[in-house]
Amino acid sequence: IPWIFFSSSITVGSASIVAQKDLIKKIYFPRMVIPISYVTSSFVNMLLCFIVIFAVIIVSGAGINFLALLTLPVIMLVEYILALGMAMLTSAITVYFRDLEHILGIVTMAWMYMTPIMYDKSIVPENLMPIFNLNPMTHVIECYRAVLYEKKIPDLTTLLSAAGLGILI
């Protein structure tokens, strides 16, 4: 679910300014509002999906670590900042290079396989770990995994790079 939010924020957010070109021509308002609205819409969708996930966790009897659950809003906020930064960057570039909208679908798919979503980070060879850790979504997904699957409190300091990148962009 977190990856779907991130991926859809980038792909849909990249085309947001181009899609609303008629509105932009008619009314003056800060252009940043458009990608923000698209990313926020995807974020609300993710929050609603998390309600279903928590219901499944409770019904299945898997259990929840409530102390670890308190870190979930921080993880979500960092992911939101990163997705918003990427969406703003790609939406600005897409205005000049319209094909970027289509290329981003392929890029996010490749990015998904470079992020430990369907596999554990421990299977990555040690010599590739420095390169692997450059991916900001690796840290975000690892924190989600720690809270939801391992029921542990994640190391939130690993999220600083993702938050910093999102703010920088």
Language model regions located:
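Transmembrane alpha-helical segments that form the membrane-embedded catalytic/substrate-channel core
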Residues: 2-13, 80-92, 113-118, 122
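Short alpha-helical transmembrane interface motifs in multi-pass membrane proteins
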Residues: 2-7, 36-37, 67-75, 125-130
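Transmembrane helix boundary and interhelical loop/hinge segments in multi-pass membrane proteins
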Residues: 5-43
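Hydrophobic alpha-helical transmembrane segments
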Residues: 12-27, 48-57, 102-119
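Hydrophobic alpha-helical transmembrane segments of integral membrane proteins
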Residues: 26, 31, 69-70, 112-113, ...
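Alpha-helical transmembrane segments and their short interhelical loops
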Residues: 31, 36-107, 151-169
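Membrane-interacting alpha-helical segments
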Residues: 101-104, 111, 138-141, 145
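Membrane-interfacial helix-loop-helix junctions in multi-pass membrane proteins
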Residues: 116-168
